[in-house]
Amino acid sequence: MAEQTERKLLLSRWGQLRTERESWMSHWKEISDYLLPRAGRFFVQDRNRGEKRHNNILDNTGTRALRVLAAGMMAGMTSPARPWFRLTTSIPELDESAAVKAWLANVTRLMLMIFAKSNTYRALHSMYEELGAFGTASSIVLPDFDAVVYHHSLTAGEYAIAADNQGRVNTLYREFQITVAQMVREFGKDKCSTTVQSLFDRGALEQWVTVIHAIEPRADRDPSKRDDRNMAWKSVYFEPGADETRTLRESGYRSFRALCPRWALVGGDIYGNSPAMEALGDVRQLQHEQLRKAQAIDYKSNPPLQLPVSAKNQDISTVPGGLSYVDAAAPNGGIRTAFEVNLDLSHLLADIVDVRERIKASFYADLFLMLANGTNPQMTATEVAERHEEKLLMLGPVLERMHNEILDPLIELTFQRMVEANILPPPPQEMQGVDLNVEFVSMLAQAQRAIATNSVDRFVGNLGAVAGIKPEVLDKFDADRWADTYADMLGIDPELIVPGNQVALIRKQRADQQQAAQQAALLNQGADTAAKLGSVDTSKQNALTDVTRAFSGYT
């Protein structure tokens, strides 16, 4: 009875979540039609379908701009080619420890290797594209023996979410289809419904079966127990059409294992809005104008014809070089255009260009491609960097939300999995009980922080100018602190920065070497003087013998 009640509750909540999501579906469907026809699952059977879906797209400017947005966010936030985050303790004194720095750097490198080996980067790119189009994205992060973690990327319409009172997503239901072979391999034949077992026995392995996966907080659990039935989140797979006493699998997670970012939220909304929603009107206008332009070109290149009545039911050739015989002497004889076709398309073409630019701006394509589209080849590197940073500041709010709803949870989930898999290097003794923080050092994150480096650069430059007049002003400048602060602003690998205690030791060794060299030089000078004095002949009359005799009492 408990399982039956649990299953009914899950089906009931799935229905409630679908009802809550329903108002978004038509909007997502329209965005899919005009921007990403292959994305979106608005019916559970919408999988692995190869029919033509791009019929509404006459001008693909919107699709290409969305592709630039996804690629720009991928390269700017989570580029596989460079480190985009680092771990810190948020305790400055502890961060200065060489052992702590080395351990944090090793863990960061290990985590980046896990991301590269798994499908993390492919999932992130898919999520960025979904965010730009539908405003909400989702990926379930599950443990994997070979790659440590594995992502199940979802698309709009395939899932429904709910949030807690702080607006954080804590519930995800998804409805999807898998083949009979996949279901039996994943859950076991005994767990499947009698219908699936019968299909498997008949060899219908490629028959599609609907499955619902529910992830939500577990209300009835015993925190003192550590088994999967008492973890903070429960995970249940079941067939909606099977008998009410059967579930495919019930387990649990210590934390919410789904990434559910939203591009931007308004008020208490659960699902986010997106650049595609803002640009949808322009995208539809562009398709309409391209259709009218094509019709106008058809009128000019293939105008309607007016023929005499005598030509009715006669063979008329309208192909280039064709011959037609008509009675030209009759009134209105001959073949001529039905009306004068002299359409001016310049205004339409100008508006098409304007609409295209608006669409690109909505997707920040001008931002990500501003270097490629630059018109001034004489710009200095400093001018290019300043323009780059100024434009990237427009992504500040989005970047903060992506850090909070994608990257922070992703790193935390991966770190937890590394602990469970026992692949972390042993931490230094001084780190016991210390919480770790994530600091993002991607190109976009650094662009947000680069304003601080500009002020530091101006200060150092002006200080150097003043030092040319009054050198003692350099006594106010702490070069060691400048090196550490500037390296932190730029996200430099801590292994490239020598710790302060090692710097003090190096300077002491250098001072000792300089002092020893000075002493050696003095000794060499004294020995050279003694050698010169020792070579003087004191038996003859000279200044040295005169001085020696004077001190000896001789005249």
UniProtKB/Swiss-Prot annotation:
Subcellular location: Virion
Biological classification of the source: Viruses, Duplodnaviria, Heunggongvirae, Uroviricota, Caudoviricetes
Protein name per the record: Probable portal protein
Subunit structure, as described in the record: Homododecamer.
Superkingdom of this protein's organism: Viruses
Broad class of where this protein is predominantly found: virion
Disulfide bonds: none
Record keywords: Late protein, Viral capsid assembly, Viral genome ejection through host cell envelope, Viral genome packaging, Viral penetration into host cytoplasm, Viral release from host cell, Viral short tail ejection system, Virion, Virus entry into host cell
Stated role: Forms the portal vertex of the capsid. This portal plays critical roles in head assembly, genome packaging, neck/tail attachment, and genome ejection. The portal protein multimerizes as a single ring-shaped homododecamer arranged around a central channel.
GO biological process, one term: symbiont genome ejection through host cell envelope, short tail mechanism
Pfam family, one: Head-tail_con
Family: Belongs to the podoviridae head-to-tail connector protein family.
GO cellular component: virion component
